[in-house]
Structures are given as C-alpha cells and as structure tokens.
C-alpha cells in the first residue's frame, strides 16, 4: 500500500483545459477535488453577504447581483469583480479562507481512500497556503485565442469580460514559480491523446504511474 499520497495542483488560466487534465488524472487512479465546485457552493451559501458587500458597486455599473429567483447572480458578480481589481481582492479575502478550509477537509477524506495521488484542480491555488503542500503543480497552458474560443463556446459572456478576466489571471504562473512550487507547464493546443501522453510522462517521472 502506498504510504505517501502526493498532492498534485492543477492550475491555469480560463479555457486552458484544467478540467480535461483532471479527468485524465481521475482515469489514472487519482482522486480529483474541484475547487471551483466548492467555490460555487460557498457563493450560494454566502450569497446574501456577498450581495450586501457589492450591491452598491454593482448598481453603479447597472448590474443586479440577484437572479429572478433571489439567488446570487454569479455571472454579474464576475463581470463586476473582473472590472475592478480592488473589488476582486476584497472578494477573495472574504471567500478564499472558507474555500481553503473546505479543500483541506476534502484532502483529508481523499487521503483515507489511498489513491495514487490527490489532485487539486484550483485556479487560484497560488493564492492559498495549499500550494506549498503540493508535491508538484501542473500549469495548463493554451494560446489566448484558443482559450477565448473555448470560453465563448461554453459561456454567455462578452469578449470584454473575457479580456478582463484573462488580464486578472496574468500572474498565475509567475506567482506559482515565485513560491518555489515544483511546476510543470503542460501545453494543451491539440488532441486529448497528445495531452494525455504529456500528462502520463510527468506522472511516470514523478512515480505516480508505473508502480
């Protein structure tokens, strides 16, 4: 039985293919944790608090943070936050500690299952202390134009919003490296089979596969 279960971080900018890589890792016996899913849960749980924090700024931009059913309008929240870095920072200071606590609980449960590795699919991993807990990090990369196409295909948002989001994510790789994380860049520009070979090569090199 494996005595040490490595923690693998998966990061990258919007549209790079983090979820595809996570699925590949799951197929290879890894336990995958989706930080975005946890974040969405918290957005619903703390929706009233978030609306209270940002409703004035949202109204000034003609945005409503409430859906018709009364829930938090996460798409409008994203438009607001990515248009103003200070608001994004305030939101992250409020939410990220809560996300991190949930992820720590998820990691503890995953360790009990003794998988080949635990995968933390977390775009903002570099903004939490969990980055230092990772054995290594996969930074998923794709050209901006390809990422733009992927995002437009799956989301009903404007090009302006996507450009602002992309701009806010510029420092992901540099911040990971700055914290001395053992980071591998994985290009995702073609077929899934090619991406899978790259992932397998890294997993084999790190001893996750081939035992």
Curated annotation (Swiss-Prot):
Record-linked InterPro entries: Depp_CoAkinase (IPR001977), P-loop_NTPase (IPR027417)
- Entry similarity comment: Belongs to the CoaE family.
**Protein name in UniProt:** Dephospho-CoA kinase
Per the UniProt record, which EC number(s) apply here? Answer: 2.7.1.24
User: What pathway is this protein said to act in by its record?
Assistant: Cofactor biosynthesis; coenzyme A biosynthesis; CoA from (R)-pantothenate: step 5/5
Where is the protein situated, by its record's location annotation?
Cytoplasm
| Reactions it catalyzes | 3'-dephospho-CoA + ATP = ADP + CoA + H(+)
Q: Which GO terms describe its molecular function?
A: ATP binding; dephospho-CoA kinase activity
Q: Which UniProt keywords apply?
A: ATP-binding, Coenzyme A biosynthesis, Cytoplasm, Kinase, Nucleotide-binding, Transferase
Q: What is the role of this chain?
A: Catalyzes the phosphorylation of the 3'-hydroxyl group of dephosphocoenzyme A to form coenzyme A.
- Source organism superkingdom: Bacteria
The main location is cytoplasm
């Amino acid at each position: 039985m494996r005595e040490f279960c490595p923690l693998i971080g998966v990061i990258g900018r919007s549209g790079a293919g983090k979820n595809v890589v996570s699925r590949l890792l799951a197929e290879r016996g890894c336990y995958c944790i989706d930080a975005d899913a946890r974040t969405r849960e918290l957005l619903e749980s703390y929706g009233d608090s978030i609306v209270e924090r940002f409703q004035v700024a949202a109204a000034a931009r003609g945005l409503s943070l409430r859906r018709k059913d009364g829930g938090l309008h996460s798409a409008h929240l994203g438009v607001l936050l990515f248009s103003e870095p200070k608001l994004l920072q305030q939101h992250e200071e409020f939410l990220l500690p809560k996300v991190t606590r949930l992820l720590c609980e998820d990691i503890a449960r995953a360790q009990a299952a003794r998988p080949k590795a635990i995968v933390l699919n977390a775009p903002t991993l570099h903004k939490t202390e969990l980055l230092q807990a990772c054995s290594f990090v996969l930074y998923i990369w794709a050209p901006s134009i390809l990422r733009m196409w992927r995002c437009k295909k799956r989301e009903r948002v404007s090009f302006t919003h996507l450009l602002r989001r992309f701009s806010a994510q510029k420092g992901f790789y540099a911040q990971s490296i700055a914290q001395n994380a053992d980071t591998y860049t994985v290009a995702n520009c073609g077929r899934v089979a090619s991406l899978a070979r790259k992932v397998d090569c890294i997993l084999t090199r790190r001893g996750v596969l081939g035992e």
